[in-house]
């Protein structure tokens, strides 16, 4: 009745009292859910009291028919506020997080990894991306993207073996093959092989890049052609090298 009258403050107080009472467990559960909704709808903080109340509900009523809705509300708050560190702490306080919440955790760790990468904190980025990959069963494309950026992070640290492994895993897993990132994975693998003096593999990877590049990165495209020429020079295929 209170909710229908839109008197959210009175409704919140009534539901809070019912949730804290010694009433029938089903009544307590319903009241706790309604209380959580009231808090969510009247909260002045984007990431505040509503998150705490939703966490409490999931821990007290993990098998509730409302658990999925509450989980979805939490995911919405986690992703929309972009308070990623606070979101991780919130998820860690939930005893039995849903698949939706664990998928959100996977994506949050990926976002934290990209932030660290942008700040040239490559070791920290590797930690975040690795944790995101561990949760890969929840969203395969996020896992693939994390593998790519793991490769980039290792590459920046000159750890070429790990970089190559992650780029190759990314190429095997991703379904988004019509992207600049897909092309760049081959470009990076070309350079890894080139530095290892594996000129045959390097040439193949640079050729893969050239075939996939759509003109979005003319600098890398010109460089790849030069490296194909260098690969031919290094194996003394001079006629082929002249073409580049």
Where are these regions (language model features)?
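Acidic, polar-rich low-complexity tracts and alpha-helical solenoid repeat scaffolds
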Residues: 1-244
């Amino acid at each position: 009745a209170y909710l229908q009258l839109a008197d959210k403050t009175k409704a919140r107080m009534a539901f809070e009292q019912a949730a804290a009472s010694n009433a029938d467990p089903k009544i307590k559960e319903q009241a706790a859910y309604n209380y959580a909704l009231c808090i969510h709808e009247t909260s002045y903080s984007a990431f505040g009291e509503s998150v705490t109340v939703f966490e409490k509900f999931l821990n007290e009523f993990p098998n509730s028919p409302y658990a999925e809705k509450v989980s979805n509300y939490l995911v919405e708050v986690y992703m929309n506020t972009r308070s990623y560190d606070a979101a991780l702490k919130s998820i860690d306080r939930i005893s039995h997080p849903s698949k939706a919440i664990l998928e959100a955790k996977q994506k949050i760790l990926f976002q934290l990894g990209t932030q660290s990468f942008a700040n040239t904190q490559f070791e920290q980025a590797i930690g975040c991306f690795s944790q995101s990959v561990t949760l890969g069963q929840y969203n395969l494309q996020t896992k693939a993207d994390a593998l790519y950026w793991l490769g980039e992070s290792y590459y920046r640290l000159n750890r070429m073996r790990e970089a190559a492994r992650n780029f190759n895993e990314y190429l095997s897993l991703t379904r988004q093959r019509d992207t600049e990132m897909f092309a760049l994975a081959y470009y990076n693998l070309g350079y890894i092989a080139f530095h290892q003096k594996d000129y045959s593999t390097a040439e193949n990877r640079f050729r893969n890049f050239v075939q996939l590049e759509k003109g979005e990165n003319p600098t890398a495209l010109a460089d790849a052609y030069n490296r194909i020429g260098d690969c031919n020079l290094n194996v003394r295929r001079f006629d082929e090298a002249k073409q580049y």
